[in-house]
A protein has these predicted regions:
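Conserved acidic carboxylate
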Residues: 12, 36, 59
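Charged docking surfaces used in two-component/phosphorelay signaling
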Residues: 16-27
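Active-site beta3 strand of CheY-like receiver
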Residues: 49-54, 59
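Basic, amphipathic DNA-recognition helix from helix-turn-helix-like DNA-binding domains
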Residues: 61-63, 69, 73, 78-139
């Protein structure tokens, strides 16, 4: 949710970084705590006290990927992963196991604050829709998306999507049969302008495509239109 004072937990073994980020985010209106190992981080993230977690990959006692895997068994707490710059594999794995976004180190604290707010706005949207019965269900080609309950069924079977994947699918289903530009998806879902060096949108789409699976004839439901965007195909 997005409140006047969102509570953030930083899980990173770099105490100096935790202190610097905490100071900046506090000025930006967040309430920030930090822990310095994976086991303590998982316990904090599962405590129900926080609105979001900032999670480093390299941690003592339990690495960030294992923290996230265990967290996702019990919680949908939004998570931004801190990854090594240039390490695409860390980013891919993080998004595959349920991170909402990633930010490579070193990063600009202003960018981190912007990412936090964007994700918290999505979470706030989830809650407001969950209390409303006015948002219409979208049903296309065996895929049924219900905004009010945040449930997606594929041929009658529920699939588990992150908040980003859900919003991407909603955008594509709403324009089924039409190409949706990458720039538009980035601005409407990720809430930032598309960067030539930011592959997070591609990774989210790839994960969404895997979760949706192929049709009975083996064709993909979502296709990439090179250098333009994506299309939810119709049969």
């Amino acid at each position: 949710m997005l409140t006047d004072m969102n509570k953030i937990i930083i899980i990173d073994d770099d105490e100096e970084l935790c202190e610097l980020v905490s100071e900046y985010l506090t000025v930006e209106g967040f309430e920030v705590s930090s822990v310095n190992d994976g086991e303590s981080g998982l316990a904090a993230a599962l405590s129900g006290e926080y609105d979001m977690a900032i999670l480093d990959v390299m941690l003592p006692k339990m690495n960030g990927f294992d923290v996230l895997r265990n967290l996702r068994l019990e919680s949908k707490l939004p998570v931004i992963m801190l990854t090594a710059r240039g390490d695409d594999m860390e980013r891919i794995v993080g998004l595959e196991i349920g991170a909402d976004d990633y930010l490579p180190k070193p990063f600009n604290p202003r960018e981190l604050a912007a990412r936090l707010r964007a994700i918290l706005r999505r979470a706030a949207g989830d809650e407001s829709e969950g209390s409303s019965d006015t948002t219409e269900k979208i049903s296309v080609d065996g895929v049924e998306l219900t905004p009010a309950s945040r449930v997606v069924l594929v041929d009658g079977v529920e699939i588990n999507l992150t908040s980003v994947e859900f919003e991407l699918l909603r955008a594509l289903l709403s324009e089924a049969g039409k190409v949706v530009r990458k720039e538009d998806l980035s601005e409407s879902v990720l809430e930032r302008k598309l960067s030539a060096f930011d592959r997070s949108l591609d990774m989210h789409i790839s994960n969404l495509r895997k979760k949706l699976g192929t049709r009975s004839d083996g064709s993909d439901r979502i296709k990439t239109i090179r250098s333009v965007g994506y299309i939810y195909t119709l049969v």
